[in-house]
Amino acid sequence: MINILILSAGTRDKVVQYFKEALAGKGKVIATDCSPYAPAIYEADEYVLVPRITEPGYLDKILEICREKQITGVLSLIDPELSLLADNKERFLEVGTVPIVPDAKQVDICFHKYAMYEACKALGFATGRCFLDRKEFYHAVENGELTYPVFVKPESGSASLDIHMAQDQETVEFLCGREDGLMIQEFMNGQEYGADVYIDMLSGEVVSIFVKKKLKMRAGETDKAESFQEEKLFALITDFVKKMGFRGIIDIDLFEIDGNWYISEVNPRFGGGYP
């Protein structure tokens, strides 16, 4: 039997349904959430109401569920929980459950945008320039290396929260003066794409890639899109995934500008386009 535990299922009904279809007759899907009003939990074979992720004892409760329900693999649909799974990988393995996330190092890089920028540069993958130091950014502008507008955003975070576009130095100064932990990112003036990539947890080999051309966004997630296929892009994604050492499920944001591909961000989970 293959039993899958989906944490923080929320409103992601289809994700739960897809797992049930794939496991029909082979295992069960168990879902959790902190609210009895989360519709997706009622799509699962079984569900368990749990404390909020921030409450003491949350991890112990999840481990208890894994042990009692003989869970084969566990995954989460929300960002704050991914680090919890990755950081406690050994504890899950001790009860016979595989956390379906990349290793803690890769998860940490994904959640820190400047770290991802540096990783892309080090591995030779094109990406928009990022700056933590305003003086370094202003110097680059003066040298004609990039132009306004630019994005000012938190160096860590998700769901496109607190992202602002700055058209000039005055706006950059104002935004960066309001709070700490911000970075300046080059504006990528091109078509945005999203890639859902599935990587074997053991071998690290890419199992499947699905690319979508983004047509409409909602709170940083894809709302409307159309499928897209290009061998050059698929080869780039496969190379990137292997060199980064990813495992499990990842969602890559990319831009196409004048026929060239740029990697923007990586989310180590199902993309928001999955309802």
What are these regions (language model features)?
Residues A40-Y42, G57-D60, D108-H112, S160-I163, ...:
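Short, charged, surface-exposed secondary-structure boundary motifs
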Residues I163-F240, M244-G245, F255-E256, N260-Y262:
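Phosphate-binding site of ATP-dependent enzymes
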Residues V107-N189, M201-S203, E231, A235:
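Active-site nucleotide/adenylate-binding loops and adjacent lid/helix of ATP-dependent enzymes
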Residues E226-S227, F270-P275:
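ATP-dependent carboxylate-activation loops
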Residues M1-I100:
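ATP-binding N-terminal substructure of ATP-dependent carboxylate-amine bond-forming enzymes
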Residues K214-L215, R269-G271:
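A short acidic/small-residue loop/turn micro-motif
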Residues I249-D253:
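Flexible, glycine/charged-enriched surface loops at secondary-structure junctions
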